[in-house]
UniProtKB/Swiss-Prot annotation:
Positions with biased composition (Low complexity): 34-44
Protein name per UniProt: NAD(P)H-quinone oxidoreductase subunit M, chloroplastic
Membrane topology term: Peripheral membrane protein
Transit peptide: 1-37
EC number: 7.1.1.-
Pfam families: NdhM (PF10664)
Family: Belongs to the NDH complex subunit M family.
Keywords: Chloroplast, Membrane, NAD, NADP, Plastid, Plastoquinone, Quinone, Thylakoid, Transit peptide, Translocase, Transport
GO cellular component: chloroplast thylakoid membrane
Subunit details: Part of the chloroplast NDH complex, composed of a mixture of chloroplast and nucleus encoded subunits. Component of the NDH subcomplex A, at least composed of ndhH, ndhI, ndhJ, ndhK, ndhL, ndhM, ndhN and ndhO.
């Protein structure tokens, strides 16, 4: 995890998917009923194939424009939710399958739960919150400013997917976009590799050295 920041918590503005039709839910979220298990598996395979195809496509020209529009709608930097000192570790309720929703990529961990940054209490019953863990292996050197940029992008993406189904697929879309954003920060020179990292494998490409071409002597 980035040593300069705590886990970032954002309100989840996504739609919850019920597991049992007769269960009651009082949160202000739309409800969707799942298909049978076989259809779930087929849909998951299809979604993974679609995600792989999307990641291989070049970014659309209007991507930067949409990003600027999301930042315009957001007033000021993203702020984390307040800490809950009395939070306890709880499993997700049975109506949602009793297992957490999460997205795990190389530098991003997203959980549909509340995680106390001090006690590490993992409350999965608070599905109206998303917790972001940034760079848990410390592959990059982070500052407060660069961490805040990732948090702002995370909040913008959550707002962008408002109303979408709260599922692992949606969280993977957010996580994939954040990975691309981190790569952009690296290529722009805003972050750099942590040469003291426990695992040094340059997952986003080998370091680039900038030099002044005018200082290269002519070969005669």
């Amino acid at each position: 995890m980035a040593t300069t920041a705590s886990p970032f918590l954002s309100p989840a503005k996504l739609s919850l998917e019920r597991r049992l039709p007769r269960a009651t839910w009082t949160a202000r979220r739309s409800v969707r009923f799942p298909p049978v298990r076989a259809q779930d598996q087929q849909q998951q395979v299809k979604e993974e194939e679609e995600e792989a195809a999307v990641e291989n496509l070049p970014p659309p020209p209007q991507e930067e424009e949409q990003r600027r529009e999301r930042k315009t709608r957001r007033q000021g930097p993203a702020q984390p939710l307040p800490v809950q000192p009395l939070a306890e570790s709880k499993n997700m309720s049975r109506e949602y399958g009793g297992q957490w929703l999460s997205c795990t990529t190389r530098h991003i961990r997203i959980y549909a739960a509340y995680i106390n940054p001090e006690t590490n209490a993992f409350d999965q019953t608070q599905m109206d919150k998303l917790t972001l863990l940034l760079d848990p292996t410390d592959e990059f050197v982070w500052t407060d400013e660069t961490c805040q940029k990732v948090y702002d992008e995370f909040q913008d993406l959550v707002d962008h997917y408002e109303g979408a189904e709260l599922s692992e697929y949606t969280l993977r879309l957010i996580g994939s976009d954040l990975e691309h954003f981190i790569r952009k920060l690296l290529y722009d020179g805003e972050i750099k590799y942590n040469m003291m990292s426990r695992v040094l494998n340059f997952s986003m490409g080998k370091p680039r050295i900038k030099f002044n071409s005018s200082q290269i002597p002519d070969v005669k």
